[in-house]
């Protein structure tokens, strides 16, 4: 039922009850009726506004909840990335220092392995071997290990760097025929590639 029909019914009812009243009473009654209708209209407007505000409030709550979830997800992702970077830094943090130490260590190994019969030199060689062992122990404590590449091993491009290809009948194709310097791993990652000669 529309608002206009409701108002007509109210008017009929109101006038039928008040036929015998005086003109002044009718005027008073009209004023009260108009006040009532105005208040009813205002009340309906207020109720409509309250309903609109409730709907807006629900919409804003949903948006806020969604935004909060997005922010929490972003914080979680950033935390995971930070933790991953921190783990990688701890795991591979010694890489640069180790790379700088490995080249002189390899030179020292070549000196120790060079043939020499001089007793004075042999005493130095024993001292150098002790130093090499200490450096290897320090490197291993940081999860850095020599690959221990040997002549006869198969060439692996993921671990070795071929410096020279040598024609030979003694070895199969892609078999290592000479090791110029050993390679090193840090955890599961190549730190320094072994430099080798390969049979072709």
UniProtKB/Swiss-Prot annotation:
Keyword Iron (UniProt): no
InterPro entries: GrpE, GrpE_coiled_coil, GrpE_head
GO terms, biological process: protein folding
Domain of life: Bacteria
UniProt cross-references to Pfam families, sorted A to Z: GrpE
Subcellular location: Cytoplasm
Cytoplasm keyword on record: yes
Keywords of this entry: Chaperone, Cytoplasm, Stress response
GO molecular function: adenyl-nucleotide exchange factor activity; protein homodimerization activity; protein-folding chaperone binding; unfolded protein binding
GO cellular component, one term: cytoplasm
Matches recorded under SUPFAM superfamilies: Coiled-coil domain of nucleotide exchange factor GrpE (SSF58014), Head domain of nucleotide exchange factor GrpE (SSF51064)
Role noted for this protein: Participates actively in the response to hyperosmotic and heat shock by preventing the aggregation of stress-denatured proteins, in association with DnaK and GrpE. It is the nucleotide exchange factor for DnaK and may function as a thermosensor. Unfolded proteins bind initially to DnaJ; upon interaction with the DnaJ-bound protein, DnaK hydrolyzes its bound ATP, resulting in the formation of a stable complex. GrpE releases ADP from DnaK; ATP binding to DnaK triggers the release of the substrate protein, thus completing the reaction cycle.
Subunit note: Homodimer.
The family this protein is said to belong to: Belongs to the GrpE family.
Protein name (database record): Protein GrpE
Species assigned in the record: Mycoplasma mycoides subsp. mycoides SC (strain CCUG 32753 / NCTC 10114 / PG1)
Taxonomic classification: Bacteria, Bacillati, Mycoplasmatota, Mollicutes, Mycoplasmataceae
Gene: grpE
């Amino acid at each position: 039922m529309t608002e206009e029909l409701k108002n007509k019914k109210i008017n009929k009812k109101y006038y039928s009850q008040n036929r015998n009243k005086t003109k002044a009473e009718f005027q008073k009654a009209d004023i009260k009726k108009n006040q009532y209708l105005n208040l009813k209209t205002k009340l309906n407007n207020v109720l409509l506004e309250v309903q609109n505000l409730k709907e807006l409030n629900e919409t804003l709550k949903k948006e806020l909840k969604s935004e909060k979830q997005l922010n929490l997800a972003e914080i979680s992702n950033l935390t995971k990335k930070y933790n991953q970077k921190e783990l990688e830094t701890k795991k591979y943090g010694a890489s640069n220092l180790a790379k700088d130490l490995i080249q002189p260590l390899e030179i020292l190994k070549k000196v120790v392995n060079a043939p020499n019969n001089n007793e004075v030199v042999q005493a130095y060689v024993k001292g150098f071997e002790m130093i090499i062992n200490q450096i290897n122990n320090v490197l291993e404590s940081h999860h850095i290990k020599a690959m221990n590449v040997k002549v006869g091993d198969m060439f692996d491009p993921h671990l070795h760097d071929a410096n020279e290809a040598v024609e030979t009948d003694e070895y199969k194709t892609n078999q290592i025929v000479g090791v110029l310097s050993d390679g090193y791993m840090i955890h599961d990652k190549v730190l320094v590639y072994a430099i080798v000669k390969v049979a072709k």
